[in-house]
Curated annotation (Swiss-Prot):
Belongs to the eIF-3 subunit E family. Residues 222-399 form the PCI domain. The keyword Protein biosynthesis applies. Keywords: Cytoplasm, Initiation factor, Nucleus, Protein biosynthesis. SUPFAM superfamilies: Winged helix' DNA-binding domain (SSF46785). Pfam families: eIF3_N (PF09440), EIF3E_C (PF21357), PCI (PF01399). HAMAP family: eIF3e. It is found in: Cytoplasm; Nucleus. This is Eukaryotic translation initiation factor 3 subunit E-B. Component of the eukaryotic translation initiation factor 3 (eIF-3) complex, which is involved in protein synthesis of a specialized repertoire of mRNAs and, together with other initiation factors, stimulates binding of mRNA and methionyl-tRNAi to the 40S ribosome. The eIF-3 complex specifically targets and initiates translation of a subset of mRNAs involved in cell proliferation. It comes from the Eukaryota. InterPro entries: eIF3e, eIF3e_N, PCI_dom, WH_DNA-bd_sf.
Length: 446
């Protein structure tokens, strides 16, 4: 379903190495011409040192042609450069492999003290850090992400936050952990990078906006694979004003992922309040971005159009199954979306026939009754079934005045943030800069 594919938009904000998994996914889904995807891979690989991979792609794309001499020459050059960097880095790596050095690294949190220890015991010098950084980048360019992550960890421990390569190394470490699918380490790196960006007083507002936009896109890999990711994405994208502002200004298509995280959230009480806030954002941005997922939310919670919501839900299945980040959410999404339709419909009608409900949920009456019984049994629904009449009767959940005051206060606070963001959006014009390509940079992203 190429109509709703966001790969091109998202790739604009990713390092080229992070785009490869997306292209592999599209290749499996067969929604694009395979030759076009292979050409896209080859174009991306031309700026990396993954020459063997590039040769394989070239063979698949042009099975009747010989491998170009330029690729063979590049391979020779890359191997020579790798050997040179290995020889330069070998004494540095041996320092870090020393058991006493490893104990010092585990016990010492201060990079300056550790640097002084290495300088005293191993004659460590400042230029070694630059060598280590270059070697880490080269390993990354070659597709050796585990080596890159290891050397970037050493680099990060030793350099101060003011170092010209400090921020760039954080991006590289995050990318490496993502590509190795080390989600715990990636979440830690994501948090560290976010803190660095948010506490940066040197960058201009535009640079900070660009950095946050990149972080939002890179974080999708982590949030939709880490066990706590769907909670964290809501907190960051919806309730952190600077990041919500970045989404509204630079990348409203991210609302697809925020909406999916909200709909699939397992905390029922939290989900209801979050949905209210999400609906406000979707309404506000509907003129800049919409797809079946955001339209489903709008049909159900703004227009109360259950027939349209049901149609959009069927479209959502096609969107989810063809989205690299969301395909694993499909079952949770459909289950919870049906629950939302059911709850909203019953909240309006209070009493409803099971046969009518089955029609709204695209189920048989027997399936619908079993589904409702399971909801009641699992305490996810306050309702009773009248089997004789074939009706479902909703319970009456009274909300305390205290809770009403809290919700109204939250709503006012949220609306104030939205108003401030709208003013800021009108003052500053968005400027989409090129994506950070960590491996091709020498001095970070600026």
């Amino acid at each position: 379903m190429a109509e709703y594919d966001l790969t091109t938009r998202i790739a604009h904000f990713l390092d080229r190495h992070l785009v490869f998994p997306l292209l592999e996914f599209l290749s499996v889904k067969e929604i694009y011409n395979e030759k076009e995807l292979l050409q896209g891979k080859l174009d991306l690989l031309s700026e990396t040192n993954m020459v063997d991979f590039a040769m394989d792609v070239y063979k698949n794309l042009y099975p009747d042609k010989e491998i170009p001499h330029s690729l063979r020459d590049k391979r020779t050059t890359v191997v020579a450069q790798l050997k040179q960097l290995q020889s330069e880095t070998e004494p540095i790596v041996k320092m870090f492999e020393d058991p006493e050095t490893q104990r010092q690294m585990q016990s010492t949190r201060d990079g300056r003290m550790l640097f002084e220890y290495l300088a005293d015991k191993h004659s460590f010098r400042q230029e070694y850090l630059d060598t280590l950084y270059r070697y880490a980048k080269f390993q990354y360019e070659c597709g050796n992400y585990s080596g890159a992550a290891e050397y970037l960890y050493f680099f990060r421990v030793l350099v101060p936050s003011t170092d010209r390569n400090a921020l760039s190394s954080l991006w590289g470490k995050l990318a490496s952990e993502i590509l190795m699918q080390n989600w715990e380490a990636a979440m830690e790196d994501l948090t560290r990078l976010r803190e660095t960006i948010d506490n940066n007083t040197v960058s201009s507002p535009l640079q900070s906006l660009q950095q946050r936009t990149w972080l939002i896109h890179w974080s999708l890999f982590v949030f939709f694979n880490h066990p706590k990711g769907r909670d964290n994405i809501i907190e960051l994208f919806l309730y952190q004003p600077q990041y919500l502002n970045a989404i509204q200004t630079m990348c409203p298509h991210i609302l697809r992922y925020l909406s999916t995280a909200v709909i699939t959230n397992k905390d029922v009480r939290k989900r209801r309040q979050v949905l209210k806030d999400l609906v406000k954002v979707i309404q506000q941005e509907s003129y800049t971005y919409k797809d079946p997922i955001t339209e489903f939310v709008e049909c159900l919670y703004v227009n109360f159009d259950f027939d349209s919501a049901q149609r959009k839900l069927r479209e959502c299945e096609s969107v989810l199954v063809n989205d690299f980040f969301l395909v694993a959410c499909l079952e949770d999404f459909i289950e919870n979306a049906r629950l939302f339709i059911f709850e909203t419909f019953c909240r309006i009608h209070q009493c409803i026939s099971i046969s009518m409900l089955a029609d709204k949920l695209n189920m048989t009456p027997e399936e619908a009754e079993r589904w409702i019984v399971n909801l009641i049994r699992n305490a996810r629904l306050d309702a009773k079934i009248d089997s004789k009449l074939g009706h479902v009767v909703m319970g009456n959940n009274a909300v305390s005045p205290y809770q009403q005051v809290i919700e109204k206060t939250k709503s006012l606070s949220f609306r104030s943030q939205m108003l401030a963001m709208n003013i800021e959006k009108k003052i500053s014009h968005s400027n989409r800069n090129e994506t950070p390509n960590w491996a091709a940079q020498d001095t970070g992203f600026y």
